[in-house]
């Protein structure tokens, strides 16, 4: 079951499922966008459920190198439910729908304060902070980016 609640600012929507919790950023969002000047769309509940299903099925293989996941840093595919998410919908030149998912460790209270208001970018922090893209049209997970350590 998924629950969505519109936020007061009309730019984000709360979305929750059995193993995920986060915010959908609408195409109206004008704050900092790490994806640059792109063709955006607003994902709906079914887009997020599909993206999370693809993520769950494919992240272990995509994460086989375990980049920046040593010592005290979590192995991301084993701790998916420990991350809060931010979802941004984009479209490719071919018209494919892609969702960029930004993952923030759920115990980082400072970062979580702004989770519904702006895209959170953290430098360093190893695998406590990472992102990935999901092509909803092709069903492929790609462009895994895991923060490094200082």
List each language-model region with its residue ranges.
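Bacterial Sec-dependent N-terminal signal peptides
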Residues: 1-11
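Surface-exposed acidic loop/strand-edge motifs in secreted or periplasmic proteins
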Residues: 9-114
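Extracytoplasmic electrostatic interaction patches
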Residues: 97-150
């Amino acid at each position: 079951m998924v629950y969505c609640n519109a936020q007061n600012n009309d730019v984000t929507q709360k979305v929750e499922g059995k193993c995920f919790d986060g915010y959908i950023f609408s195409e109206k969002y004008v704050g900092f966008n790490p994806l640059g000047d792109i063709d955006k769309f607003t994902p709906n509940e079914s887009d997020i459920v599909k993206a999370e299903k693809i993520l769950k099925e494919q992240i272990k293989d995509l994460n086989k190198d375990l980049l920046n996941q040593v010592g005290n840093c979590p192995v991301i595919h084993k701790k998916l439910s420990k991350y809060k998410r931010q979802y941004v919908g984009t479209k490719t030149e071919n018209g494919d729908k892609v969702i960029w998912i930004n993952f923030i460790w759920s115990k980082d209270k400072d970062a979580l304060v702004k989770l519904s208001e702006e895209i959170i970018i953290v430098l360093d922090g190893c695998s406590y902070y990472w992102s990935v893209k999901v092509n909803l049209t092709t069903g492929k997970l790609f462009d895994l980016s895991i923060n490094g350590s200082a």
